[in-house]
């Protein structure tokens, strides 16, 4: 081989070596930048240096949860709930041969990775206070899971007074931890403050997918136990009375897990013609109330349940003539965010923000704008009857069924099968200035009438229910006798397929039994038994 060829090959090797060295250097630089960025993120998210030493994997944190524990989690609806530790616990339990059970406390419903997967894995012994998951519902209705369905505003006091067992360990999602070891909550507050205060240990999930700009939305204020309880100093929906963090302290935090997963909120269905008709009827009623001087021009603070009908009603307010509105509610969904964006709402107070997957990018993009209009509170404050009565809430919630005297069933299908739970509807219904329940007049393609002679389960009595709205019309029950209520509901709210049947029942009951609230007890629940036997109430 000639000397020239050797020199040429040597040069090529040197060039390759140089290229390799450059690539290695680039990788080192990139790695350094990643490490530097990670350190910067950690510093912003975990501002207490000693607590940075408590960062562990989700698997390590899950090992801290023991069989028989009372486990409490943050969040309210699929917002602000822990994402990774619950998954790790499911994986751990599925690998075990022996039984592993916990009692689960939440604020409200939660993510499917908890309610759904834990139910399927047989992890949950007892569940309090509310759920919306189909797997959980199945286990509740077959008796596998003991379910205590309670008014959401009661939960914190039950824990504070040890009416229910104390919390062993709380798993809390956070935006950040402060220098003092306190927690900046994310999109769902719920019972977080109460859980943290009462838990022996706290696992914190720092979720980098939750924007740091969420800091400042929370207004954390907790109540003293009676007899030392003081009036809550809220006189309008926008009042801030607490802190922007949940008091914890670094000693109580036993583990920190870094996550990067967005809330898996539910997509909202399109507004159906029936939902739109309910919305139109309700807004027409509110307009009439303003014209008659029963409501101010900007209404009173609005509380609304969740779902397509509620969304349609609130969406209708965007197209209405109302302005300078306020909301004092639980869940802030798309329609409330849109009320803010369209300039109709000045302030919205709730305990969680639960935008649909379609609305989430817009919320994040405009988060600084929304932060000036939104207040997130613990649910014992967002759902507090004292405040609802003081500020005069307009409460709008959904009924499963209503009877001719205005009693409402919100929870049980055919009287026995749990659907979701009472949630916060009872917190507001008895204490609101105006209590409205909406429902479609029929279900199951017309085989079920949502207005029946007697409800198969009672969540809200006739004494709490003021107005019923269906796509057929509005029944204003205020100041009416039971017999007058029956006529108003049958004439205004019942589907044509069932109107004559209901009037026939009512007239027969008046003749056969009479009384202030006439019922034929032999036939009062016959519509339900007929459906169970034949598949139709007709």
From Swiss-Prot:
Induction: Efficiently transcribed only during growth on ethanol plus succinate. The active site is at 330 (5-glutamyl coenzyme a thioester intermediate). It comes from Clostridium kluyveri (strain ATCC 8527 / DSM 555 / NBRC 12016 / NCIMB 10680 / K1). It is an enzyme of class 2 (transferase). PANTHER family: ACETYL-COA HYDROLASE. Keywords: Transferase. CoA binds at residues 305-309, 420, 424. It catalyses: succinyl-CoA + acetate = succinate + acetyl-CoA. It holds the Pfam family AcetylCoA_hyd_C. Belongs to the acetyl-CoA hydrolase/transferase family. Forms succinyl-CoA from succinate and acetyl-CoA. GO terms for biological process: acetate metabolic process; acetyl-CoA metabolic process. This is Succinyl-CoA:acetate CoA-transferase. InterPro entries: AcetylCoA_hyd_C, AcetylCoA_hyd_C_sf, ActCoA_hydro, ActCoA_hydro_N, NagB/RpiA_transferase-like, Succinate_CoA_transferase. Its EC number is 2.8.3.18. One of its GO terms (molecular function) is acetate CoA-transferase activity.
